[in-house]
Amino acid sequence: ARQRDPLTRFGQAWANPLVMTGYSLSDIPCEGRLEAEQGQFNLRNLVANVRVDQEQVRTFERLCEQLGIAATVRARIVARVIAAYPRLLNPELADKAAVSSTFDSGRSTSPDASGTPLAPTRPMLRTLQDLRSIKGVTPQVLETLAPYVTILPANTWLNGNTASAPVLAAYVPGLSLQRAQALIAERDGGHWFINRGDFVNRLRMPELEMASVKVGITSDWFRLRGQARSGQRRVV
């Protein structure tokens, strides 16, 4: 399918409901659907190349502000995510040390000591539900975040063809929610983004540098949500 259509968008076969009725009377019927996870903000992006990605932090903050998540709560979420991954304490010093010297005395005062990533201090997050232990992250907060935020095993770009208006507005500094909603309406009317350049051009923001926009047109990560029924029992 990818060879015939390079885009990942709604209306393709993956977006159709999945129904498996079974081949015999003993088989339990199942139904489900695939969700393109790259239409959401990926919390894994807060750390990339053992560095805290400050632009992605600002993107998440803009999204939370739109959703009405308190600044203290979103700051705790950011801190919790960052603590789950190796990261450089002083990436600028590490870059300079890598260029200026290859000597490592093994002491913390060595210029190269700044090039050793800090080990994670918290367990890796696998789902949004793992945020429940954070002060202020209530079931209501998780319910608010769920349509717009995900946690994937790798860094990803946002798919402009499956993203919602709030996520697009958060990803592009200066893009209003109203303008993002207009772009989504145009997209869902059949005018899909064909590449990153097309997306940037349709923003009509000439001051925006295309290289700074991490919005693509495809998805590599999907989540399967399904359920099986047997009599009065249902397994999700």
State each model region's role.
Residues A1-V236:
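Compositionally biased linear targeting/interaction segments
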